[in-house]
Amino acid sequence: VLNQYLTELYYQVEANNKSYASNNELAVFPDQR
């Protein structure tokens, strides 16, 4: 059960990161470029 919860949490974080990157393609990691 815990593994399933972590998998869902990881997937949700990945989806949020992709959405954020889509909205701010050039400003995701400005200090690392």
From Swiss-Prot:
Keywords: Chloroplast, Plastid, Thylakoid. GO terms for cellular component: chloroplast thylakoid. The keyword Nuclease does not apply. It is found in: Plastid, Chloroplast thylakoid. Its main location: plastid. The keyword Coiled coil does not apply. This is Unknown protein from spot 19 of 2D-PAGE of thylakoid. On the 2D-gel the determined pI of this protein is: 5.6, its MW is: 24.0 kDa.
